[in-house]
Amino acid sequence: MEKLTILLLVAAVLTSTQALIQGGADERQKAKINFLSRSDRECRGYNAPCSAGAPCCSWWTCSTQTSRCF
């Protein structure tokens, strides 16, 4: 039982040490998520107003008559 307790303590110390060393990885992960989700916000969905500065998503077309995505 005593060996198990020591083993668990060593595992906890190693895990926390690894978390401290990899502390900057969270920021890189957030930047990657922001980059990937940014493209979703730049295009417009169905029936949304569209223009050259605010294009429709690739599966929609901007109507020249209504300036809306369809």
From Swiss-Prot:
Q: Which residues form the signal peptide?
A: 1-19
Q: Which domain of life is it from?
A: Eukaryota
Gene Ontology MF annotations: ion channel inhibitor activity; toxin activity
Per UniProt, which keywords does this protein have?
A: Disulfide bond, Ion channel impairing toxin, Knottin, Secreted, Signal, Toxin
**Pfam families tied to this protein:** Conotoxin
Q: Where in the cell is it found?
A: Secreted
Q: Does the keyword Kinase apply?
A: no
Listed InterPro entries: Conotoxin (IPR004214)
Task: Indicate the residues removed as propeptide on maturation.
Answer: 20-40
Cysteine disulfide partners in this protein:
43-57, 50-62, 56-69
Per the record's keyword annotation, is Signal included, yes or no? yes
Q: In which tissues is it expressed?
A: Expressed by the venom duct.
Domain notes from UniProt: The presence of a 'disulfide through disulfide knot' structurally defines this protein as a knottin.
Q: What does this protein do?
A: Inhibits voltage-gated ion channels.
Name the record gives this protein: Conotoxin Vc6.10
Species in which this protein is naturally found: Conus victoriae (Queen Victoria cone)
